[in-house]
Amino acid sequence: MVKTTLVIMAAGIGSRFGGGIKQLTPVGPSGEIIMDYSIYDAIEAGFDEVVFIIRHDLEKDFKEIIGNRIEKVIPVKYAFQELDDLPEGYERPAERTKPWGTGQAVLAAKELVEHPFAVINADDYYGKEAFVKLHDYLVADAGKKTDGYDICMAGF
């Protein structure tokens, strides 16, 4: 059986949100955050582990609000998006203070992801069907790729 990983980008600064930590803000009737729904749907679809990409300054709140609870249900790992963690040959301009975005966030998790994976935003709702489609794609024909690459982008 092929294992699959759900990578959740949760290091955003939410500059347009207007206060608070957007990805940790309750939206559900019992205080659920959007990630609660995504992780539940991903587990139901067959995902085996979660890698959260966060910032160090969010770690304590993040673990208290969701991480410690989720790791009782599914294995959890943490990657930290650092402003200066760039590919070889690149340097951060001195005036740069914001994270680099999706590509750099995913690179932050490269040492932790060992299986086929899907990447989602922490503050977007995808629905169960999206996770079923992603998981089914990741496990289809596993190990039969001849060029070493199997890339897919799904937009929801």
Task: List PLM regions with ranges.
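Short helix C-cap/helix-to-loop transition motifs enriched in small/turn-promoting residues
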Residues: E71-V73
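Short, glycine/charged-enriched secondary-structure capping and boundary segments
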Residues: I21-Q23, I65-N68, P93, V132-D136
